[in-house]
Amino acid sequence: MPLQNLTPPPHTQIQDNKSLKQNSKQENKDENNVQNPEFKAYELEAVTIEAPTFGEYQKYQTGQVLDNKMLESAPSGNGDITSILRTLPNVQFDNSQLKSTTPGEIDPANISISGGLYYQNNFQLDGFNMNNDLNPLGSAIGGTRADSTTVSNTPGRSQGLNIDTSLLESITVLDSNIGAAYGGFTGGVVEANTRRPKKDFGASINYQISQGNANPNAFSLTQYKIPQEDLNSFLNSSNSAQQPHFIKHSFRSSIESKINDKLGIIASFTTMQSFIYLNAGDSEYLKNTLEGIKKTQKRQSYNFFIKGNYDYSDTLSLELSYAYAPQYNNYFLAGVKDSGFDFLTGGHQLGLKSQKLNALGLLSTQASFSYMDSSRTNSENYFAYWRPSAEKNWTVDKSATQTYKWPQEGGYGNIDQKQINMNLKTQQDFEALQTSILTHNFSVGAEFGYVNAYYERVKDFWWGSYYNLHPLKQGQSCLDSDRFCSASPVYFQGTYSGESWANNIGQFVGYGSMYKKGKIALDSVTLGGFLQDDIRVDLSKAGTINARAGLRLDYDTYMSKATLAPRLSLNYIAPWSAWEYGKNFGTQITFGANRYYGRNLFAYRLADGQSALEYGISRSTPGAWSYESHRSTTNFQKIKVPYSDELMAGISQEVYMFALNLKYIVRKGRDEVRRMCADANGNLLASSSECKWAETNYTARYIYTNEGRSDSDILSIMFGNEAPIKLGAMDNFFMLSYDRTNIYRNYTDFNTDITQAELNNEMIYYEGIGFIKLADKPGSNFGQPITFRLSTTHVFPFYKTKWSMNNFFRIRSAYNAMARIEKNSRLYPDKVMQYNGVPVDTYIKFKVPWTFSWDMRFGVDVNVWRGNTLSLAVDIFNLLDTTNMYLLSGDYGRASGSPMYETGRQFWISVGYKY
């Protein structure tokens, strides 16, 4: 089905009908007539408050909607709500999202909307926020961070809940000219709206499978793109950053009932399961003392959902919903005994909505509670290195002197991170106030929220360092409770660091760290409100002017900052748009000037104090430890709230059933958050490494500042049909889009350390551009310069079957990935450019070629008996198995500067049954 445009809905959805009274009857008439709640009229006595219908021109070119039919017909893959947004312009993905080395992952994709950072979008489920503000930077699960996660940190993701699209009626993406009802973003708003019950009784079940095996002689539904010289090491991978063999299972089910004209209930259960088969360790490790030669890592996502709708009267409607969406990602540390652990994300969300027609118009109120996790569980509370011995024997090099060959065991300990939110929102939409040529539609809203976020190390964790392993000598013994002492003689009999291991009877750890159990917590109260007037000026034969002016106020006790965000959108509708013979050629012109304030993440505060839980431990003989306390490496201080100023202009043109939309967006992000290493007086230090060891050696501390900035300009064009093109009995829809994106940002994310050069905005050399200021350097990710997209849907009924095919074609332009050479480089001094005789940081380009992909879904629905439908479908990603390269910018000569490849052709096969 076609993509749709819309004017931004209020915080709380209005009913899907012209009046609350008509709701049940209308839904029973046509279960497929799904419309966005805002775009229907509601009646109160003789007064009618109207808004554009779902298919009308959007007044302010705010965004797009993917409706239920688009969600069902498009290739779904993992089924997360962001991956399917690849069909939309103004939405950019992480360069490495489709990488061929990690096809077994199931986490939702990170997206940038209109140049914003991926963790500065506002994700909502039925109007309730589901943002992860604990630590969204940890989203690189399946990359290098997963197996080498630090002792104190855990991965996260930008979305608090991983919601499956099978639950949804629509996904709304707001990317510009966003009304004052929305706050807490500098990117965009993604609103997932769940389905309502429509049938007297209905049920559905669906199973989907995909798998991959990189072994050239094995059956595989997934084609890997691995360089031949890397294939052998990839096939023997023991690291989740390289996944040569996986299988995915998806199970989806739902049940619904319109019990009567007033009450309806819908419930669903979905799960996505991925099993990734890896070696327990590389060739340096014996496997017989581990759990087995092969180990299986798991990714398991669950969605439990129930929602009830109750029309209490003609003027009052209630909706209650509950979602439980946990995800368990299981890992192990390669070659490390007893090292399994889980990352737990997701959680609970409970919401209640009411909609009341009153004397003023429509009053919408909603209350919600959410409980979200970002925790590490099931991990051992110790980690130890050992020299090889009869007891510590899981290494092939019995006399190993290199520490990476030494036996290791244990995990990093359990960490409990929670984000608990309670929110209350209310909004009054007033009945229209009309004069001779003016019509005012006022809206006012208020919000109250409370959040408790905390980081807790559940138990004491002990780390035994390889720096100070000592021989256990004659007359010494190990205590039974001492995990860091072994009475098994070590094979090594030489001398190390002046200490003889001859005739040893074992070994013990003499130095390490103890991370004491403890909790770091914060509470924050948020207040918000907005006022908005949507004005219509009827100029008769000269057309119509619409103006939406709004003001949004937000305050929170976390940063103790109040922000005031003006929003202004203007729209002109040409006069012929209303003529009998001109309405098929309607024209609209749109302008906008808006400010959006983002969110300050709780990670800034929770980082302060984590390293203070660490104690240095040491001993010269087996027995008691001596302790040395450490200080925090981060000093939290209140900072400003990041914001983005937006200017936009657009034009919409209708030609019969076709619509052309052109939009140009300019955004300037300021006061954006990044990290710096500072001395006790807050002055920038020359090297951020001074902060990494601040717990013992320095008074240096990491601090978060508002030195980040960005500039974006995006041009997008969309053209498609709003009604089906009939070819016999076949309905055909298509949507063609183009976007051109330029993003300039002086950092990557909030943990990117500031350098003195950046603070001074020094000159750099950027190959292909020349000498520029550092702040003018193009962004290195989420900024594909040019993208063409074509989406087509074809539906053909035949006898008792319905055949459907969806195609999605995407062409992405070539781009330059940049490798940096520092101005004082000793390895490549001949490549460093000079500006006025002074060496400057030099960025060397690597040309990444154009890429093409074709994704397809082909399905058939068979009416087997009285509306009982059997469904079969095949999803094919990268149908032509093209080799698409990507490259992450990094330092010159490093691995990050090596080309990588996206996944090749991949099949998903599904079967379902619906009643």
Predicted regions and their residues:
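N-terminal periplasmic accessory domains that precede
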Residues: 111, 157-162, 173, 185-209, ...
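Transmembrane beta-barrel wall of Gram-negative outer-membrane proteins
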Residues: 202-204, 240-328, 344-360
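Structural signature of Gram-negative outer-membrane beta-barrels, strongest in the C-terminal barrel
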Residues: 441, 447-451, 517-657, 664-666, ...
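Periplasmic N-terminal accessory/gating domains of Gram-negative outer-membrane beta-barrel systems
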Residues: 21-36, 48-50, 54-179, 189, ...
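Gram-negative outer-membrane beta-barrel transporters
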Residues: 539, 663-821, 912-914
